Amino acid sequence: MRYYLFLLITLCSMAAHAEKLRIHVWHQMIYGHRQVLAEVLKEFEKQNPDITVQATYRETEELRSGYQSAAMGGSGPELVYGPSDQIGPFATMGIIRPLDEVLGVDYFKQFDPLAAPTFNGKHFAIGDAVGNHLMLIYNKKLLPVPPKNSDELIEMGKKATIDKNGDGRVDQWGLVFNYTEPFFFAPFIPAFGDDFIKDDVKPNLNTPALANTFQFILDMRDKYKIIPKECDYETANALFKDNKAAMLINGDWSWGDYKEAKVDFGIARIPMISGTGKWPASLVGTKGYSLNVNMKSPQHQEAAVKLLMYLTSTPVQLQFAEKVGILPSNLDARDSDIVKNNPLLKISADIMEVGHPMPIVPEVRAIWDSLRIQYQKVLAGSLTPQAGAQGAQVLAEKQIAEMNEVLKPDAGAYVLKAIFALVILGGIWMSRKSLVAFVKGFQGPNRFAYYMMLPAFIGIFAVIVYPFFYNIAISFSNFSLRTFQDWSLVGFTHYVNAFSDPKFYSLFLKTVIWTVVNVFFHVTLGVFLAVIINQVMPFQGFWRALLIIPWAVPQYITALTWRAMFNQEYGPINIVLQKFLHLSPIQWLSQPTTAFAACIITNVWLGFPFMMIVALGGLQSISHSLYEAARLDGATSWQRFRHITWPLLMPVMVPAALLGSIWTFNNLNVIWLVSNSGEPGDQTHILVSYVYKAAFNLYRYGYAAAVSVIIFLILVIWGLGMLKSQYQKETK
Amino acid sequence: MVKRLLAWVSILLFAVFSLYPIVYVISVSLRGDNAFQTQSLEIVGPNSTLKNFVSLFTETDFLLWLKNSLIISGVTTFAGVALASCSAYALSRYRFRGRNMMLFSLLTTQMFPATMLMLPFFIILSQLHLIDSFWGLFIIYSSTALPFCIWQMKAYYDTIPRELEEAALLDGCSRWMIFTKIILPVSSPALVITALFSFMSSWSEYVIAAVVLQDPQLYTLPLGLRSFQASLATQWGLYAAGALIVSIPVLILFISISRYLVSGLTMGSVKG
């Protein structure tokens, strides 16, 4: 007996031991930082043998949306790590916890105030580093001393912009940076006289300062020609690493990269604007840890807090500082020799002095978005700087209002509930005979058919039909940023808004153009190639397999590949245009029309093989005797195509084209990935990508659901019409 | 003669058009450390190296992702083919109340923007505790590809003469035996296509997997590849090498069954 008891106790303790607490952390650290994180977590697990930590990397945007949905579903990681500007939205949604309750008010005093930002008077995150700010990084080999003011910047930039071999192409640039992104351009705005956000919340965009900043960038690009016509982050980075750019504006996170590439670089403040005598103010932020409101148990909470304190503690911060060169947020850590003797960190701290703290309220997202849209329009030449600044203010105010809107149920809500009830009752009443027949069917003569279908339809119901109705409910609700936890049905507002917005109609028009152009090319190219393969080519199987390739490659890989191929500086498309056709390079991705064209080209590439295969199948089913008879009658090849091939191919191509149009109409991937979520200036959106953005970037779930229901209705009505006319043709 | 020449020229042009992006990815994957940026059009440059492929297998969890993806795609394909072939048979051979309605509603499921189903998916799955489990993905993947697959299979079954079955019925075969012994074997082109679509829908799906799978031990290939792309510093070499390896199984699959593809995709609509 005692023996058994002993065994039992051992087993229990083993089981208890086996059940370690598992704490999840989601973060968005870049590659080098991730490795340090892995090391310090290993150390933490050694110190706390009862806890295991699971660190998961997520790209910034994905971390945001993924965490939102996870927390809403009542789960998610215990700790979430990210830039401070996600605190505002998360706290507003009520999915992260105030830390004051668990850590005590005095805990935060050991940190740089920048690293312990408050939102509505409470701390929601602790930063492990301060910085994330932009600076001028210069290549010492090409430029021994950095410019002090903007006049010098332009002078030095002009000197450093060189066409070495005289082929009309610049081989070395004066300045490069990801200038189409507002974050990289924002430091200049206050230097021209005015902040772009007032009192931490209000957009202040319709100012001469903003217009002058727009003009300044345009001048650098068009008048002084010291920055490339098109330059994204990757391009700027590559040019600088290849010693093909004298100066670069980038943040403290990038140093490691340049050290590894063995660039001899120095850092300095972004040059003072000569006209105003003010320094550009980089946004200084923090990245830090927040606590999920959903905890599996008090033990999890305790372990998560322990981990949070560990990750922001002095030794861990020093380890990061030493290995990847971040500026610690812990004041003790900042006093250590590791930090004090690091020349980069010293200059960095000096640059931060003229910096501004990064605002964390959710409204900032709308301000960035409006700024980006208008700025890219100005860069593409479709707006003057003044009009751009004015428009940005209007747009930002509108977006903030939409984002903060909390709809109250109006009379529509009652009408709606009544309609819902009526529809459900009516549906049951109308289909009562069918329902009875359905239930009886399981015993009737057709029961075999019922059992055969049942599993598939349960699946379809669970995965498509039920979520679909869920979405319809959301489309009538006030589900958005401020009602994340408790939304309710409010009425028809979103539908009214959608239909009264002129943007909806222009997007619809663009979607129709997108669909028609794409499907036209898919079908014509498909039929053309199929005819050739079927009639002319030897080794049919070989050609068929070769031309099928675009269809086989996963779409997200394709889209990103084409985006790289359209790159103005490095993309093979422009290189071919220049080298072999002697044309000037096309700025594919920074002009709305060419960017849209780039999306179409990509999608044509993706879609023609499907139509080709369908057409091949159709062609092979046409009997040869028809052609022989026609030949005997002396029909030309065009006549044979027109009177035999085409009419016999139609019944195959029409359903395929119908399905193809539906897929193209709803194709989010290509637009989203090729144009980098609608760039430039939100002008490449089609309806679905616009819906996606409204829901997942601007928190307007209700509105997005309403527009997607409208998309659905458009397609159903159109599809019904097509089917009907096809049916009539066939019965004639 | 001129026509023949034109045909050759245009087919070669299109071969380049369809192959080039792949060649481009190969070339990026072979470049050394710094990246996809070069202004030369060479595919294999002087600095080319297989380093990226080596580190893909030695330094990352690529094999783990591969295993996960194979499990998920395998189960999805099997379930998809089983469900689609059964229900399509019923829709093809039997006339019952609500049949047309069902066929049409299958088509309409393609008309709703799929991304908007994400939110409800997530809420449902977390209520069923299927987050961070392959089961959630099995259910979603095998069901989302179903409408297209059912249509496809039904169109194919419609072309199989009923006389085949009637003879067997007279011989005393059960319906299930007729289905498995007679119908399925002659439907191989359509089955292959259904399998292909089910496989593809899970092999390259990213958005849903990103929400459902939160534990890196469960990552699929697309999720793993995506982790090479940090917000501001993409490891292009690794990404390209991974992208190639992800595409290869699908490419082989497509090429080896392209013969079936032609008959499977169109038989139904031609004769039906």
What are the residue ranges of the model-derived segments?
Chain A
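Extracytoplasmic/periplasmic solute-binding protein
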Residues: F124-L134, E152-P203, A245
